[in-house]
Amino acid sequence: MSPERRIEGLALKVGPLGEHDRLLTLLSDDVGLIRLAVPGARKPRSSLAAAVPLTTMELQVGGRSGLLRVRQLRVQHNFGNVGQRLETLAAAQALSELSISLVAGDDPVPGMLSAVLMHLERLELLAQKQRSSEMKSAEGERVDRTLATLVQACVHLLALGGYGLPLQTCCRSGAALSPPIGNWEWRCSLLADEGLAIGSQAGAAIQINPSELALLQRLTRLELPERQDGGLMGPRPVWLRLFTLLESWCRVHLPRPVRSFAMVREAVANA
């Protein structure tokens, strides 16, 4: 029997395994992406029933061979509050799917877990803000920030996972991507197989203007770009365009589709 060990991480996905067990997909700094059997977790009053998605936990695991089994678990934090709003739930699920696409088993990605947790914490805060019937603008700002948080999270996670969209150099000419703010005729094209190219290119998945490119380039920073009054920089249509751009990039380059992107788009449209 292999020695038991402790693993800490974030549950990205949990599904049924047989009649009473669950299959847990965990993101960890130590082992990357690992799949674990959680015996009896579907039984009433099971001590392992807390193995649910979007939960950070400490596990004691072991097993003879093949799929390791969870012996004990201790919940550290549950991000279930993101489910209070459809848009934050969809964004959190998209983060989980994206992480699964970017991290291989037994191949940890430094910084991936902390980045995912940072953006989940932001989504959780957005979900917990009370609704105000008197201020529709505040509700709209919350939806916009949810979308912007996901867009920025995609930029961060793709870069960490080795699939980052090059944001500083034209993929065709090698020239610097320096958006000429105020020149509304200038365009930058996403060639999904290659990257961003200066000008209106044939076959482009989407074209963006100078201010949209400048906003996209700022997303590599830690915080979301804000105006001087503290409001989010950029209106919702711009964030939707940047979301479409990154969605197109992911569709071509990632090994599996992020299906929750469609749910995010629907949730934002219906908000």
Curated annotation (Swiss-Prot):
GO biological process, one term: double-strand break repair
Keyword DNA repair attributed: yes
InterPro entries xrefs: ARFGAP/RecO, DNA_rep/recomb_RecO_N, NA-bd_OB-fold, RecO
Gene3D superfamilies: Nucleic acid-binding proteins
Homology family: Belongs to the RecO family.
Matching PANTHER family: DNA REPAIR PROTEIN RECO
Protein name: DNA repair protein RecO
Organism per entry: Synechococcus sp. (strain CC9311)
Taxon lineage: Bacteria, Bacillati, Cyanobacteriota, Cyanophyceae, Synechococcales
